[in-house]
Design a protein with these regions (language model features):
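Non-cytosolic membrane-interface motifs at loop->transmembrane helix junctions
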Residues: 44-52, 81-85, 111-124, 148-153, ...
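Membrane-interface transmembrane-helix boundary segments in multi-pass integral membrane proteins
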Residues: 11-16, 51, 175-210
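Membrane-interface loop-to-helix entry segments
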Residues: 121-133, 193-196
Length: 234
């Protein structure tokens, strides 16, 4: 199958593409294995570790790279398209998760991490940095340019943000505590602002990733592709 002319490397393929996707899939799978042996109150709580946006993002990353591995092994264009469709949202989401996590942690780790939930550096990097790195490399090196417009990303991100808020409140109604201590400090109005702001960040992240892609792979051509919002993500 011929790669998109703006792709830096051939994908799907059984060479570099397969190597990157296998490494990413192994990293994400290890993170989930870690959760199954990490004994905390979350392990027996309602919602398990899926109360954390980090784990929801990690799930999307795992799905994208599993599809990527299958596409590389079978050279399937359909699986390659499916991987790209998941990655279009998973990649900017993971970038935002990394920025918010490390930024807030630098300011005050107690806003994110309750007592007894402190991670060692290696798993911490695995959850809060590796997914963003792997997915960004997949985009820049192994994917065609995104053609999804910013308003679509904003709409989808807003729906996901408020669906996550509903999910967090549902878990709180069963468990009596929030996954992030920060939520305890916010009023309802402040939470609305937080989740709206987060959806906006995902949109900005998507636009920035498109800009980086254009700079690396061909600015003018990528800009023309970005103005074809109805074109399928290949």
């Amino acid at each position: 199958m011929a790669a998109h002319p703006l792709q830096r490397l051939t994908s799907p393929s059984r060479s570099v593409s397969l190597l990157l996707h296998v490494l990413g899939l192994a990293s994400f799978s290890y993170n989930f294995h870690f959760l199954t042996v990490w004994e905390t109150p979350l392990s027996v709580s309602y919602g398990w570790h899926f109360q954390f946006l980090t784990i929801i993002g990690l799930t999307a990353s795992l799905i994208a790279f599993a599809l990527g591995v299958l596409a590389d092994l079978t050279l399937s264009h359909a699986l390659f398209q499916a991987k790209n469709a998941v990655a279009v949202l998973a990649t900017p989401l993971e970038v935002v998760i990394s920025i918010l996590y490390w930024g807030i942690r630098f300011i005050d780790p107690n806003l994110l991490i309750a007592d007894g939930f402190v991670l060692d550096m290696l798993p911490d990097m695995g959850f809060h940095l590796a997914p963003a790195v792997f997915l960004t490399l997949d985009l820049i090196l192994l994917s065609p340019p995104w053609t999804i417009p910013a308003y679509t990303i904003m709409a989808i991100s807003t729906v996901i943000a408020f669906a996550y808020w509903y999910w967090v409140e549902l878990c709180f109604s069963h468990n009596g505590w929030y996954p992030y201590p920060l939520f305890e400090l916010l009023s309802t109005e402040q939470r609305v602002l937080l989740f709206t702001f987060s959806a906006g960040l995902v949109t900005v992240s998507s636009s920035c990733l498109k800009w980086v892609y254009a700079r690396v792979n061909g600015y003018q051509a990528a800009q023309k592709e970005a103005h074809k919002p109805l074109k399928k993500v290949q």
